[in-house]
């Protein structure tokens, strides 16, 4: 079983989603998990303990294991991510430029089959629509929406 498959099986078995996995040159393994209700420190501890056990049993070499939430600027990688975050503001970087640009920022529309829509501000300030597929994307991330106004 490949490392990604092993980790994804473990994480999903605990009721979480594997968002991303990074392996650094210094032996550090970074795992990013999520669930609809968000991720707590206890969730990270639970996944860390289980992964330490699984990686030891499977004899996977690593120096350090880090499990965390994907953060406010969560990457979008799967079609399910684009469905879940429809209506959110996102930044999408395409592999190949379209109309002379690769990076777009706008409001995500729910996928229609394999096609994903992004409503963005066009050259003349009018609303424009970009249609793309997962294969067209280099990277896509949520744009954090933080409200610093205090509640009264």
Swiss-Prot record:
Top-rank taxon: Bacteria
Annotated localization: Cytoplasm
Database matches in InterPro entries: Ribosome_maturation_RimP, RimP_C, RimP_C_sf, RimP_N, RimP_N_sf
Keywords per UniProt: Cytoplasm, Ribosome biogenesis
GO terms under biological process: ribosomal small subunit assembly; translation
GO cellular component: cytosol
Protein's UniProt keywords contain tRNA processing: no
Entries under Gene3D superfamilies matching the protein: Ribosome maturation factor RimP, C-terminal domain, RimP-like superfamily, N-terminal
UniProt KW Acyltransferase keyword: no
Function: Required for maturation of 30S ribosomal subunits.
HAMAP family according to UniProt: RimP
Family affiliation: Belongs to the RimP family.
Protein's recorded name: Ribosome maturation factor RimP
Organism of provenance: Burkholderia lata (strain ATCC 17760 / DSM 23089 / LMG 22485 / NCIMB 9086 / R18194 / 383)
Lineage: Bacteria, Pseudomonadati, Pseudomonadota, Betaproteobacteria, Burkholderiales
């Amino acid at each position: 079983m490949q490392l990604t498959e092993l980790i994804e099986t473990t994480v999903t078995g605990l009721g979480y989603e594997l968002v991303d996995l990074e392996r650094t040159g210094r032996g550090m393994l970074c795992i990013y998990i999520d669930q609809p209700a968000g991720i707590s420190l206890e969730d990270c501890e639970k996944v860390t303990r289980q992964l330490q056990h699984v990686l030891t049993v499977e004899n996977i070499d690593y120096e350090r294991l880090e499990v965390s939430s994907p953060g406010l600027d969560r990457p979008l990688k799967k079609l399910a991510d684009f469905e879940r975050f429809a209506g959110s503001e996102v930044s999408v970087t395409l592999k190949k430029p379209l109309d002379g640009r690769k990076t777009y920022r706008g409001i995500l529309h729910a996928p229609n089959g394999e096609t994903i829509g992004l409503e963005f501000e066009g050259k003349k300030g009018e609303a424009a629509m970009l249609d793309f597929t997962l294969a067209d994307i280099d990277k896509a991330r949520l744009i954090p929406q933080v409200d610093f106004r205090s509640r009264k």
